[in-house]
Amino acid sequence: MADLRIVAQHAESTGIDSLWFPEHVVFFREYRSRYPYSADGNPGFGRRQGVYDPLFACTVAATVTTKIRVGTSILILPQRNPIVLAQEVVAVDHASDGRFDLGIGIGWSSEEFDAVGVPWAQRGARTDEYLDVMQTLWRDEVADHRGPLLNFDNVIAEPKPVQNPHPPIWIGGGRGAPMRRAATHGDGWYGWAIATQEIAETMAELDRACEAAKRDPSTVGRKLGLPFGGSSDELKVYLDAAQRANVEEVVVSTGIGTDFLRQRMDELAMIDR
């Protein structure tokens, strides 16, 4: 945990805008599921791969910093209880003094869903309802909900988030359903591993998803996540393309290890953004 504190403080000192933490409850020696962000479908995880719970990591990072935003990239929402999660999110929002962003997705590993006992086939519908539940709890003084999975009346959920009405909700994933979900349930869309030459058309597709949902595209945020191991010049080309397409932020995934991360942060801070 000391390394996490060091990385967070170094990120803030270099002027990086935000830190994002992934979620996987467990990992597996082998996967039947196809990883959607690699050419061969292999996630490339090591045998001893592991990550802290992202809400815990966000809290630790927030409590040793004062300006940098922290977020989940991404939290696998359908694996969670939404009433419990709503309370946990409020706690992180308070611990960070309103510097928390909630990035969520439906997950890609059926093995992980099997392990935690959550039906894989229902994860999309479960995600939509859970988003409704959490936003109701954060917004209403006395909350009621009727849905196919959860029903409750006369519920008081306090305290409310620092950010009004709640921390920004970023819907993670690719095109199609995640974009439609962002347009109907989210504050923004968080795409992952979009090639430089595909950024403009991807943002145009997000605009169309918003228009189909009768929502002004300008009210839906745009964020891209980029697994990256190239040069600063190559990254600058990507950032320029993202900026032209009105992407608000690019989250750069560079690898693991405290010393390596600090070095990469120093390099990123030198890029003219």
Enumerate the language-model features and the residues they cover.
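Active-site-adjacent structural elements that line small-molecule/cofactor binding pockets in enzymes
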Residues: 1-273
